[in-house]
Amino acid sequence: MFKTTLCALLITASCSTFAAPQQINDIVHRTITPLIEQQKIPGMAVAVIYQGKPYYFTWGYADIAKKQPVTQQTLFELGSVSKTFTGVLGGDAIARGEIKLSDPTTKYWPELTAKQWNGITLLHLATYTAGGLPLQVPDEVKSSSDLLRFYQNWQPAWAPGTQRLYANSSIGLFGALAVKPSGLSFEQAMQTRVFQPLKLNHTWINVPPAEEKNYAWGYREGKAVHVSPGALDAEAYGVKSTIEDMARWVQSNLKPLDINEKTLQQGIQLAQSRYWQTGDMYQGLGWEMLDWPVNPDSIINGSDNKIALAARPVKAITPPTPAVRASWVHKTGATGGFGSYVAFIPEKELGIVMLANKNYPNPARVDAAWQILNALQ
């Protein structure tokens, strides 16, 4: 019964030239409510950007014990969706002339003297193609000297630029090195160059005391959790944000030419440029892209950790292809207690943000997002 109703509704919406707010509301609720029930998600916020305008939806609790509901001001941990901010901040540094993706890593960290670092560039770090850096920086890395020792001792499995292996230790180091010429800390650079110009006034790396009341608890095996500190966490998975700010983030990425700051405008475009291809996926800086129209099986199955975290051969795109408006641009993210997903289609001025205080399987997120955006495109 439910499937039949949903399919009919999707077909109706797809055929209309303009979806009224009530249609958007129906499509979102008919897709997300069963997802919340199936995945036992305590609280969720969704934004749909349709014809450039945001529509907001919230469900459940940010804090179960206090029965505090999710609102448009609730802060969620973004997990790896943070990498899209790191990619854009790196793009902004390129636009300012502070760094080049072709620069060797050692230019920005001369202490990195081990011979395996010869030939590894900032591009390799930003796009997980350095040769097999691990998914996580080890927990025992606490200090800058520990971090140097970790990278000095790392041994690549492949030559740089031949395989993509998704890694926090790769893009995290890119983020840390990309801001070095500015003289700013990573957090300062992100605040002044990305968050503030885009008026992301409730987006944080470190949640300030005044905002803690809005910071949702994540839930893992029934226990309330927040992300633990770790080396390069800010750069790889450390951003917390609201559904309103994340809708604004998608709007900015949909239409970068509307942004006044030229280097940020260029940074967004550079983050959506295509540097490598693996299968039908193109790797940007933080963002991942597929050609639109897209095969839903590609994005849904490709998001499964068995595929997303596996080593895959890459083909270099030289020179990189500038941002393609006919693209499905997306990124998944998770921490121990949160699961997020962002996807948008620039050509359609259409996008979605899904923030939840439970880490649930990526394919379920992508499937729901696809159903909603496909119905509205």
From Swiss-Prot:
This is Beta-lactamase. Changing L135A: Reduces binding affinity of inhibitor compound 3 about 4-fold. It is an enzyme of class 3 (hydrolase). The class C beta-lactamase family has a specific amino-acid numbering system known as SANC, for structural alignment-based numbering of class C beta-lactamases, or else the simpler name structural position. A multiple sequence alignment was used to derive a consensus sequence and then the consensus was numbered taking into account insertions and deletions. This allows use of identical numbers, e.g. for active site residues, despite differences in protein length. The active site is at S80 (acyl-ester intermediate). The gene is ampC. InterPro entries: Bact_CellWall_Synth/Modif, Beta-lactam-related, Beta-lactam/transpept-like, Beta-lactam_class-C_AS. Inhibited by the beta-lactamase-blocking agents avibactam, enmetazobactam, relebactam, nacubactam, vaborbactam, taniborbactam, zidebactam, and beta-lactam-analog boronic acids, via a covalent binding to Ser-80. Inhibited by non-beta-lactam, benzo(b)thiophene-2-boronic acid (BZBTH2B) and various cyclic boronates. Not inhibited by clavulanic acid. Inhibited by O-aryloxycarbonyl hydroxamates, via cross-linking of the active site Ser-80 to Lys-331. Weakly inhibited by citric acid. Class C beta-lactamase which confers resistance to penicillins and cephalosporins. Has benzylpenicillin- and cephaloridine-hydrolyzing activity. Has weak cefuroxime, cefotaxime, cefoxitin and oxacillin-hydrolyzing activities.
